[in-house]
A protein has these predicted regions:
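Histidine/acidic residue-rich metal-binding segments in metalloenzymes
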Residues: 1-8, 15-121, 135-153, 170-171, ...
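Alpha-helix capping and helix-loop boundary segments enriched in small/acidic/polar residues
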Residues: 76-77, 131, 166, 192
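Glycine-/small-residue-rich active-site loops that bind phosphorylated ligands and cofactors
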Residues: 106, 131, 160
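Short glycine-rich, flexible loops that bind phosphorylated cofactors or substrates
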Residues: 14-15, 130
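His/Asp/Glu-enriched short active-site or ligand-binding loop at hydrolase and phosphoryl-transfer sites
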Residues: 122-133
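Intrinsically disordered, low-complexity polar regions and short flexible loop motifs
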Residues: 157
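Short active-site-adjacent structural elements
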Residues: 161-165
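Mid-to-C-terminal alpha-helical segments outside catalytic/metal-binding sites
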Residues: 149-150, 166-224
Length: 224
């Protein structure tokens, strides 16, 4: 099929730390009656399954998107979404591509550091401009100092087209301000700033998610 990625949003209900659980232990848990697992046991089974998902995603060249940081709504365990808890996965699966969402807010520093340290970690700043415009501006400026600019994406992560359009305006406003200030400080040429912006809003995603190849296959099927 022409799937372009897989996504994990489990930070809403559990920690992002996924232990490496053996097949034998996971099998014993899986065959237990439904509802009989403790919270710790259920986590172990989830851990095993997500490792399996990463392995399959890697086989099929599908990037793995992961919700990090701030959780929508009220009353949750914010610490669940701490980006650095994913560190063991980045070490274990160097061939996988991981795309971290939302700037990892409020842990934007470790979010950026992970992308700097690991070649297979990419950053999608989706939501960050809406959460805090000023945080988005300052964090993106820091990230551009230390992370290659072909590792950035912008996504809407919205349910309605109106929300997507509004989210795009927020994102463009933040990126334009950051790049303009970097031009004024002599850190970028205008041509390079346009290249960075095109990458963030279009070209980087096309390359990383292999959209040209997969969309062309869809069009071919439509002609048949």
């Amino acid at each position: 099929n022409n799937a372009v990625c897989v996504k994990n949003s489990m930070a809403y209900s559990r920690t992002l730390y996924y232990e490496d659980i053996s097949y034998e232990e996971a099998k014993d848990l899986f065959i237990r009656p439904s509802g009989s697992l403790s919270q710790i046991e259920a986590k172990k089974l989830q851990d095993f399954m997500f490792h399996w998902v990463i392995q399959k995603a890697t086989e099929h060249e599908l990037p793995v998107q992961i919700h990090t940081g701030y959780l929508a709504g009220n009353g949750n365990v914010l610490d669940n979404g701490k980006p650095v808890k994913l560190n063991n996965l980045f070490l274990k699966y160097p061939e996988a591509k991981f795309v971290l969402f939302h700037g990892g807010f409020p842990w934007t520093g470790e979010y950026a550091a992970l992308a700097k340290m690991f070649p297979n970690v990419y950053l999608d700043i989706v939501w960050l401009p809406q959460i805090s415009r000023q945080e988005a501006i300052s964090s993106l400026d820091v990230m551009l100092d230390c992370v290659p600019y072909n590792k950035f994406f912008w996504g809407g992560d919205c349910a309605l087209i109106e929300e997507s359009a509004g989210s795009l305006e927020f994102g463009k406003d933040v990126v334009a301000e950051v790049l303009t200030k970097r031009i004024q400080r002599g850190l970028l040429t205008e041509d390079l700033a346009y290249e960075i912006a095109r990458g963030m809003f279009r070209e980087n995603a096309i390359e990383t998610f292999q959209l040209n190849e997969k969309l062309s296959m869809d069009f071919e099927r439509m002609r048949m």
